[in-house]
Amino acid sequence: MAKGIKKHQKRISSNTMIKYKKKLGIFNTKISSGPHSKVKSVSLLNIIKKFFHLADNNQEAQKVVKTGFLYVNGKKCLSHKFPISLMDTISFPLANKHYRVLLSKAGKLTVYEINQNEKDLKICKVIKIINASSKNKIIITDDLRELKINYAKIKVEDSLLIKTINDEIVYALKFEVGSLCLITRGKHLGTIAVIKEIRKTKSLRKMIHLEKIDGKKLTKKCSDLLVIGESKTSILSLKHYI
């Protein structure tokens, strides 16, 4: 007889997006289903314990979440298992503190404090476009948002700056030469680079030639990149990151 999906997660088999102290215990908080995959995200409970230091153990961290004073992407979050990943925002309105989840230079998830003006803004990558009718199209982003548009200027691999409260598209970032990108996968995870050339191969895959801030060059696939700005300038504040 089938046992169904496992409801536990061991520390030794957890993803490597943040560093876990694997000798302090056997089990880790299992991420619930949500907008991010378990490979690229961590639970809200681990974020509270590791980065905000609001709790010493899991029981205290769960109580912090249940108070209802914590917002994720502009919406109240009451689940300590909620998946948190790249570009998500975490807010504490009572303390007037707002943070964004980014990749450190070591390729691990970390949080940086942001201004109040950016607390409801997020960069999402377009992964699929569906033709709903002759004029309207449905855009699916990397965090599983479905956005309806009536123009065809947006393409797959582009990025969108959206308001998380009402899913309004504020600005579209094109995937083209000169765009500023964040590498989200592979050896250079967490590195910022500029697109210098987009070359098609015989297998119809696009190989992207990039140049880092220090002048070093590298090559990546389209799926490994997230456009975050234009003309070497990020559309969101990354002063602590760069």
UniProtKB/Swiss-Prot annotation:
**Keywords noted in UniProt:** Ribonucleoprotein, Ribosomal protein, RNA-binding, rRNA-binding
Q: Does the keyword Ribosomal protein apply?
A: yes
GO molecular-function terms, A-Z: rRNA binding; structural constituent of ribosome
**GO terms of biological process kind:** translation
What's the superkingdom here? Answer: Eukaryota
Question: Is the keyword rRNA-binding in the record?
Answer: yes
Q: Per its UniProt record, what CDD domains does this chain match?
A: KOW_RPS4 (cd06087)
Per the record, GO CC terms?
Answer: cytosolic small ribosomal subunit
Query: Residue ranges of the S4 RNA-binding domain?
Result: 42-105
The record's listing under Pfam families reads: Ribosomal_S4e (PF00900)
Q: Which family does it belong to?
A: Belongs to the eukaryotic ribosomal protein eS4 family.
Q: Which HAMAP family match?
A: Ribosomal_eS4 (MF_00485)
Q: What is this protein called?
A: Small ribosomal subunit protein eS4
Source organism per UniProt: Bigelowiella natans (Pedinomonas minutissima)
Which gene codes for it?
A: RPS4
